[in-house]
Regions:
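Short amphipathic alpha-helical segments with coiled-coil-like heptad repeat character
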Residues: 1, 107-111, 192
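N-terminal intrinsically disordered, low-complexity, charge-rich
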Residues: 2-6, 36-38, 58
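C-terminal region of N-terminal signal peptides and the immediate post-cleavage residues
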Residues: 23-43
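Charged, low-complexity surface segments at secondary-structure and domain boundaries
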Residues: 36-41, 88-96, 195-201, 217-221
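Cell wall/extracellular polymer interaction/catalysis modules
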Residues: 39-133, 147
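Domain-level detector of nuclease and nuclease-like folds
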Residues: 131-257
Length: 257
């Protein structure tokens, strides 16, 4: 028992220290009872919790996000059916509002990576090297291992209501730099089309930050979240029942906006 108490005490100290280093806002350590070995949710700065709560208070909450028919990311010809694919969000990395001649992916890489170099003759467009501190694992990742993540996945957005948008709005969403992060390719793959209830960063100290980014995009495009997403966000941000300001769930699903 003494050893277990010592481990728990060290976890609390580390969580509080991390909060002071990342913002210093006053907050209380909340214990996550979801696992067999209960551990504290890392303390979040008060201003982060306040913004998460403010966003939750005006975000529509649905009982679930149901699949919407007609989604296809690819824009070519289906090899099996020989039919033209739906190209639901337009051609990849083709921003309809950008006329620089450089694709969205390379522009985001150039902005988010450190020690960036470019291929000669591309007018500082095609990134050939660089690294980033992965916002999901906290580890340094080199360009060869980097993937470009849509914080709110395209399929998730489509099922949540983007299926009712016009193509231009969907193209803008797919190329919005506020919804794009250079991350570990393997983590990007494991996340896939998941929302906050199905996937969170492996580093517990980065989970609330991910949730905040997710909510900012959801809010900007007036999309809903599910009840499970709402609860997951509250949990990883250490928001107790008394603090929670999220909307009450609505009956309809995400495919019927």
């Amino acid at each position: 028992m003494t050893l277990r108490f010592g481990k728990i005490r060290r976890r609390v100290i580390l969580a509080v220290t991390a909060a002071l280093l990342t913002g210093g806002g006053a907050a209380t350590t909340i214990w996550d009872r979801g696992g067999a070995d209960a551990s504290p949710v890392p303390t979040q700065p008060a201003e982060v919790v306040a913004e998460v709560n403010a966003l939750l208070s005006r975000t529509p909450v649905l009982a679930n996000i149901a699949p919407a028919g007609g989604y296809e990311r690819e824009c070519g010809i289906d090899k099996k059916t020989k039919k033209k694919q739906a190209c639901s969000f337009g051609r990849a990395w083709n921003d309809p509002d950008d006329h620089s001649g450089c694709d969205t992916r390379n522009r985001v890489l150039a902005k988010q990576l450190s020690s960036v170099t470019f291929k000669q003759g591309t007018r500082n467009c095609k990134v050939t090297s660089g690294w980033v501190i992965d916002p999901y694992s906290g580890k340094r990742v080199e360009l060869a291992q980097i993937g470009m993540d849509h914080i709110v996945p395209l399929r998730r957005a489509y099922d949540s209501g983007a299926n009712n948008w016009d193509l231009l709005t969907r193209q803008r969403f797919a190329n919005d730099p506020n919804n794009l992060l250079a991350v570990s390719r393997s983590l990007n793959s494991s996340k896939s089309d998941s929302g906050p209830a199905q996937w969170t960063p492996p580093d517990p100290t980065l989970r609330c930050g991910y949730s905040l980014r997710y909510l900012r995009v959801i809010d900007a495009y007036r999309l809903p979240i599910s009840v499970a997403d709402q609860r997951a966000i509250q949990r990883v941000c250490g928001i107790s029942g008394q603090q929670a300001l999220g909307q009450q769930p609505q009956a309809q699903n995400g495919g019927a906006r």
